Amino acid sequence: KMHKGIDFAAPSGTPIYAGGNGVIEFAGRNGGYGKYIRIRHNNQYKTAYAHLKGFKKGISKGVRVNQGDIIGYVGNTGMSTGPHLHYEIIYKNKQINPLTLKLPSGKILKGDELKRFKINYKLILANHLNNLFE
């Protein structure tokens, strides 16, 4: 089923990091999303993470998290066709396409950091493609 959000292929068990500072608004099973976490960042923005294998110990409703904290692990729960992270941005209680959201730019990778990123990206993509055909 087509949905708003973006899917990131990754091996089962890959850590998932909070996209920003906030408070866990929901952590549990959520229908077709399977194991699901929603973080409230402020009065307008939330992020959601679905199909998780599990939650990091201590993650539950009301817990404060910081950007970059591990919150859970990639899985294949709910209505999922393989291990991946389904990621959503919710603005004013409406799902929006994360790819079209205008946010301040992040760090630009250069040199060795960029090389490491490209290598890891290719490994994750290759692993996911192998899982599709097993």
Regions found by a protein language model. Name each.
Residues 123-134:
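C-terminal recognition in membrane/secretory proteostasis and scaffolding
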